[in-house]
Amino acid sequence: MKTLALIIAGLGLVSGAFALVLQYSITVTEAMAGGRSLAGAVLFYFSFFTILANCAALISHLAQFLPFKFLDVLRTRSVGGAATTAMVMVAMVYSLILAPQGAPQGESVLCDVILHYITPTLMLAWWLVSAKGKVSLQSLVWWLVPPAVYLAFVYIRWFFVQEVSNPFLDPALGQYRLLSGIFGIVLLFVTTGLMVILLDKSVGKLKGRQGRYRSSARYASRRRLR
């Protein structure tokens, strides 16, 4: 299972890095052509939750291959669970809300497919294969911190440039629709986080039972040989 987890992490690392670099090239080039400065174009690129979530997944995958002690925190199940929750959210929000609003063109299609479907699927697959059943419900509280910080960043940026990256976060929607949308996203995030924790516990327990069964089978086989 450990080897399979590393293979999946490697696939997530390669595909995620490729799509992030390609999307960076597309976004920054188009943004600067539209009159933004280089700094403004880069900030615009990083204003999307999809990009930040994929960066988190990329770092989580990369940490699995680097032996440095200071990266141990990035290899914890809690950090992996936070990245997995964010990536599953990316896939769900995109497929349910954003994708129906418009189809990307050209190279952006490839980036959209990888960043919104392939990398989230690989992240979830890695989470299941590497499950240990040791993630606590308390971890969910910490998993809510990054999206809360992101939300603060969105509106601090909006205060200065009057622009948000996602239409359902636009203050122009009106207070009621905006707050309803934010509440819905928070509720979906909490539900997704609980699902991620439940999957870890369920698969972890199943692995434990299989391990005990194999140990018992080996022990019984040795006794018969005696």
Residue ranges and their predicted role:
Residues 41-56, 181:
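Interfacial helix-start motif at the membrane-water boundary
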Residues 120-136:
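Alpha-helical transmembrane segments in multipass membrane proteins, preferentially the mid-helix core
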Residues 36-44, 75-78, 102-115, 138-140, ...:
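Non-cytosolic membrane-interface motifs at loop->transmembrane helix junctions
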Residues 67-79, 131-139:
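Membrane-interface helix-boundary motifs at transmembrane edges
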Residues 203-226:
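Short, highly charged, low-complexity non-transmembrane loops/tails of multi-pass membrane proteins
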Residues 4, 47, 161-197:
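Membrane-interface transmembrane-helix boundary segments in multi-pass integral membrane proteins
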Residues 13-31:
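Alpha-helical transmembrane segments of multi-pass membrane proteins
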Residues 1-12:
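N-terminal membrane topogenic signal
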